[in-house]
């Protein structure tokens, strides 16, 4: 079994156009059983830290509804991770009401400090964490790429909220992962994921802390419908190493924890 805890839907011209159909076809082709998705249409800043133009901005409640509409197409295969616009908006009454109404489709909240230029330990996010704690939902956050997104800020939030599970997506993207790897073992409610993380880092995390701390995630279909096979230039995808070579480096139990059992436990996926 494979659970992908980090995939995307939504369009952000001219960079991304990722559809629910792409995710489902990819799951069929590469043997992924369940996928958690968030919508990139909640991005507030682009990769150059420029505000996303107003005509491309969507209100948080619309992004939430669109995400729920997507996972309703296949609720036995897709789950929602609503992406929060933490720079410009906080959960309002409509957002909270919708989340409660469709709680069965929602498996956590997604933060993207890089695309929001807001750190997870910013005190303005306390209402987000209060809602997550009330509903028993984990927090999944991009790490890496700018100061606000570095893993230490998610660590600070996790330390302040020991009853909430926090996942460091990317383990500090674009780095040697050392800082995130060191933080991973410091709190029982802090986890990492494999999205663009070298296999060697994942193996080291399991060697240090056991097999319960890392989750399988991919960013699918960020490089197109065959993200799990090759990148945009046709080079073999990192995830082929996770599907094949990594099996030889871990025990069966360790591999199962990484690829689906940890996700089942943390996100309460049945």
Where are these regions (language model features)?
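Mid-domain alpha/beta scaffold segments of enzyme catalytic cores
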Residues: 1-117, 123, 232, 240-241, ...
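Active-site neighborhood of phospho(di)ester-bond hydrolases with catalytic His/Asp-centered motifs
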Residues: 2-5, 36-39, 81-83, 110, ...
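Short active-site segment of divalent metal-dependent hydrolases/proteases
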Residues: 9-10, 145, 173, 222
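Short amphipathic alpha-helical segments and helix-helix/interface helices
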Residues: 23-24, 67-71, 96-99, 125-129, ...
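Residue-level detector of anion-binding/catalytic polar loops
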Residues: 33, 137-138, 191
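Proline-centered flexible-loop/turn and helix-kink motifs
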Residues: 75-76, 104, 162-163, 188, ...
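Divalent metal-binding pocket/active-site signature
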Residues: 85-90, 97, 101-179
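H/E-rich (His + Asp/Glu) clusters that bind or coordinate divalent metals
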Residues: 165, 172-270
């Amino acid at each position: 079994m494979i659970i992908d805890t980090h995939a995307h839907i939504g369009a952000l011209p001219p960079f991304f156009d990722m559809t629910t159909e792409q995710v489902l076809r990819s799951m069929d082709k590469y043997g992924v059983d369940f996928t958690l998705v968030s919508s990139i249409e909640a991005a507030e800043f682009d990769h150059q830290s420029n505000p996303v133009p107003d005509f491309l901005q969507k209100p948080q409640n619309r992004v939430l509804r669109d995400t729920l509409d997507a996972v309703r197409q296949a609720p036995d295969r897709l789950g929602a991770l609503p992406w929060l616009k933490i720079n410009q908006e906080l959960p309002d009454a409509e957002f909270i009401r919708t989340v409660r109404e469709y709680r069965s489709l929602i498996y956590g909240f997604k933060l993207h400090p890089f695309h929001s230029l807001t750190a997870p330990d910013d005190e303005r996010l306390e209402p987000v964490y209060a809602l997550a704690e009330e509903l028993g939902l984990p927090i999944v956050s991009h790490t890496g790429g700018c100061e606000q997104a570095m893993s230490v800020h998610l660590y600070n939030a996790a330390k302040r909220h020991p009853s909430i599970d926090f996942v460091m997506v990317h383990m500090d993207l674009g780095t040697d992962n050392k800082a995130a790897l060191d933080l991973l073992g410091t709190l029982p409610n802090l986890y990492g994921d494999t999205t663009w993380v070298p296999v060697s880092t994942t193996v080291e995390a399991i060697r240090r802390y056991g097999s319960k701390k890392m989750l399988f995630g991919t960013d699918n279909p960020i490089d197109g419908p065959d993200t799990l096979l090759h990148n945009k230039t046709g080079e073999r995808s990192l995830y082929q190493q996770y599907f094949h070579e990594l099996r030889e480096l871990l025990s069966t139990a360790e591999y199962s924890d990484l690829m689906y059992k940890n996700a089942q436990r943390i996100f309460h996926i049945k």
